[in-house]
Regions:
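Small cysteine-rich, disulfide-bonded extracellular modules of the LU/uPAR three-finger superfamily
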Residues: 33-34, 39-49, 53
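Short, low-complexity export/processing leader segments characterized by acidic and small residues
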Residues: 169-176
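Carbohydrate-active enzymes and regulators
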Residues: 21-24
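Modules that initiate DNA replication and primer synthesis
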Residues: 7, 13-16, 27, 31-40, ...
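Short, conserved secondary-structure transition motifs
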Residues: 116-122, 147-169
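Short beta-strand
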Residues: 103-109, 146-151
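Boundary/junction segments of secreted and surface-exposed precursor proteins
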Residues: 1-4
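Short, solvent-exposed beta-alpha or beta-beta edge segments that form flexible loop/patches at the rim
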Residues: 50-68
Length: 213
């Protein structure tokens, strides 16, 4: 799955495998800039530093500039953005518990989460798939994500997160068959494949079940 990396919003740096960018985030390649951003005294300074970060297009591969052309392609990835969370760690646990989560990491600001999900739809169905996926995740997380990032060429800034989550075995999301609600029986069956309802692990089982309810 390839994406396109930009500097200063418009300066195209090239096309790269998404996993390469994710590994760079996990390995701390951008740690210096992210630390400066999170420690900045003013919103103006934070904005300046953030805008200087590399950014990438999770959903498309762009071969010329920021605008989509005939030679460009769909990546098969949809990303969600949660911001200004009071409990980032708790929200990440809920996101990681979902079978569709391919990757997630703490945002540059430190109080948000970037989420990435592999999807089966074509580019023409991107917005419909985004809306369904967003509804599904927002219900699980208990918070509303940013609805404005539905655009195909929307950029996502890099970050620094040694605990970045990556699941190469994540289930591909099909918005035409996935319901935003599941029956209790379906939830119990899925949870049973991930956790055991045994002494010493019942709290983990119930927590996992609740995250997917």
């Amino acid at each position: 799955m390839k994406i396109t990396v930009f500097k200063n919003f418009q300066d195209r740096k090239g096309n790269y495998e998404l996993v390469k960018v994710l590994n760079a985030i996990k390995e701390g390649k951008f740690n210096k800039e992210i630390t400066q951003l999170r420690n900045a005294d003013s919103e103006e300074e934070k904005g300046r530093i953030k805008n200087s970060l590399l950014a990438f297009t999770p959903s498309v591969v762009l071969n010329t500039g920021r605008k989509f052309t005939d030679g460009d392609s769909y990546s098969g990835i949809i990303h969600l953005d949660y911001d200004k969370l009071n409990d980032v760690a708790g929200a990440i646990d809920k996101i990681k518990a979902l079978e569709y989560t391919y990757s997630c990491f703490v945002s540059p600001s430190g109080d948000g989460i970037k989420v990435f999900v592999r999807v089966s739809n074509e580019m023409e169905q991107h917005k419909d798939a985004f809306n369904t996926l967003r509804s599904y995740y927002d219900k699980a997380v208990g918070r509303e994500s940013d609805k404005s990032i539905k655009d195909l060429n929307r950029l996502c800034f890099v970050s620094s997160d040694p605990e970045l989550y990556l699941n190469e075995e994540s289930v591909v999301f099909d918005y035409t068959t996935v319901s935003t609600t599941r029956t209790p029986e379906e939830l119990w069956e899925y949870t049973s494949r991930k956790e055991t309802f045994t002494v010493g692990n019942r709290n983990n089982f119930i927590h996992f079940f609740a995250c997917n309810a």
